């Protein structure tokens, strides 16, 4: 019995190293906050310089493009961004930023048509990468991650394996004041082996924590005060993630590092804080009659006609519920 317990103890100690050994070493780049504009040639020149320098580095396995690829989110400019990104020798993966959603002239449909979708998923040498939209979903609103994307993330990580390393890719930081339901995301992904969130939006390097989970924001690709564009480089080693800034024509500079084996947060814990819902108690005469979880985002008021409630969602469905008890009657 003692021998069996010793073997089990040793297996428990060795398991993290076994998981660690399953991934290989590699390097990838991150370009963010490109801000192409029909009225300003500088962002185009900046991206072309970054693409040329990335193409000159044989060790880049792929490129993450983390949002705000345009200034105003219009279809014509997004097509020009794609033409430029297509010059990359390495495969690239792209997500939306707030500039693609706030001022979209297509109701946020053009991005998916041009780039093949609003999120991405791939596994590279033992690490799972998941990229998703962090909003906003209405003009000038806070960022928001829709329920179907949160559900998609957890389903993908379940298939991949809870103990295997995952890197999540967004535009916004998952912070109060940036994303209104940040806590829903961090609570949902906490049980998994999240090694890092990668994002942009702030136009400068930031090393953050999202309810304990490490998060990186990379500088904008736009030229800095010295007139130099720049992007991020990530080296994945056997036990670490090394983060660099790469200014055009200069050696890369490391400014952050993260362990691939050591824990950063309690996988059984909760968000550090939650929104204040005390306003719901200010009207004691108003009583909750029923609640339905639709599994989709709803950004408009329901319509009531006689004994029925009609609700439209961001997946394109109109659903009818019974006013009395919330029973789903139909949808299309």
What are these language model-derived features?
Residues 265-299, 303-332:
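Extracytoplasmic/lumenal domain signature
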Residues 17-80:
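N-terminal active-site segment of His-dependent metallophosphoesterases
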Residues 1-23:
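Bacterial Sec-dependent N-terminal signal peptides
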Residues 75-165, 184-196, 206-218, 224-237:
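Extended active-site neighborhood of metal-dependent phosphoesterases/phosphodiesterases
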Residues 33, 67-68, 97-98, 171, ...:
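Active-site glycine-centered loops adjacent to acidic/histidine catalytic or metal-binding residues
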């Amino acid at each position: 019995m003692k021998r069996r317990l010793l073997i089990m103890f040793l297996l428990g100690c060795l398991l993290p190293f076994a998981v660690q050994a399953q991934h290989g070493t590699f390097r990838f780049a991150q370009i963010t906050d490109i801000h192409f504009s029909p009225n300003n040639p500088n962002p185009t020149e900046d991206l072309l310089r970054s693409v040329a320098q990335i193409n000159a580095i044989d060790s880049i396995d792929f490129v993450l493009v983390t949002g705000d690829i345009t200034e105003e989110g219009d279809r014509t400019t997004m097509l020009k961004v794609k033409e430029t990104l297509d010059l990359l020798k390495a495969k690239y993966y792209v997500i939306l930023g707030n500039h693609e959603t706030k001022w979209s002239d297509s109701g946020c449909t053009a991005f998916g048509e041009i780039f093949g979708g609003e999120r991405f998923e791939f596994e590279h040498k033992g690490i799972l990468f998941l990229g998703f939209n962090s909003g906003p979903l209405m003009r000038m609103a806070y960022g928001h991650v829709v329920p179907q994307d949160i559900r998609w993330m957890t389903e993908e990580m379940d298939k991949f394996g809870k103990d295997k390393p995952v890197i999540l890719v967004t535009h916004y930081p998952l912070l109060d004041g940036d994303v209104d339901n940040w806590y829903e995301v961090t609570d949902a992904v906490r049980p998994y082996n999240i090694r890092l969130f990668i994002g942009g939006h702030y136009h400068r390097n930031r090393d953050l924590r999202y309810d304990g989970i490490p998060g990186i924001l990379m500088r904008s690709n736009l030229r800095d005060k010295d007139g130099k564009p720049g992007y991020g480089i990530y080296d994945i080693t056997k036990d670490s993630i090394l983060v660099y800034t790469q200014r055009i024509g200069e050696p890369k500079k490391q400014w952050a590092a993260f362990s691939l084996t050591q824990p950063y947060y309690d996988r059984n814990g909760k968000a550090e804080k939650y929104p204040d819902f005390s306003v719901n108690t200010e009207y004691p005469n108003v009583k909750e009659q029923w609640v339905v979880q639709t599994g989709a985002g709803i950004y408009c008021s329901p319509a009531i006609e006689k004994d029925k409630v009609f609700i439209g969602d961001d997946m394109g469905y109109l659903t009818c519920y019974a006013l009395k008890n919330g029973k789903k009657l139909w949808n299309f």
